[in-house]
A protein has these predicted regions:
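Helical "substrate-binding/catalytic lid" subdomain
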Residues: 1-107
Length: 107
């Protein structure tokens, strides 16, 4: 989902039509279930939870703790967890995970 948010943010900054982008990319090698499921919701600013951000944070914390106990470094997990935690501090914990796009829309 982080990749989807970053791709949409980049495409938006380049002035691309995001609806066309979703239709084009979804049928190719860059397509994914995350893109199909959350891309349209993100474009509509539909942050109704299928899975609450606050619960996803809890799960990522457990995974991060387990990784550390196993002496495994999961840099992407740590970064994504920090991004979500920042949004939770801003009061977005009861939104769906697709609200991660709000992290990228900050001024």
């Amino acid at each position: 989902l982080s990749g989807v948010c970053e791709a949409l943010t980049y495409a938006s900054s380049k002035g691309l039509d995001l609806d066309v982008l979703l239709k084009s990319v979804s049928t190719g090698a860059a397509g994914s279930h995350q893109l199909d499921a959350f891309g349209p919701k993100i474009l509509k600013a539909d942050y109704q939870p299928g899975f609450f951000m606050k619960h996803f944070i809890k799960d990522m914390k457990l995974a991060d703790e387990e990784a550390k106990e196993s002496d495994i470094t999961l840099n992407v997990l740590e970064t994504v967890l920090r991004n979500y935690q920042e949004l939770e501090k801003e009061g977005y914990g009861d939104l769906g995970t697709q609200a991660l796009i709000k992290y990228y829309k900050k001024p």
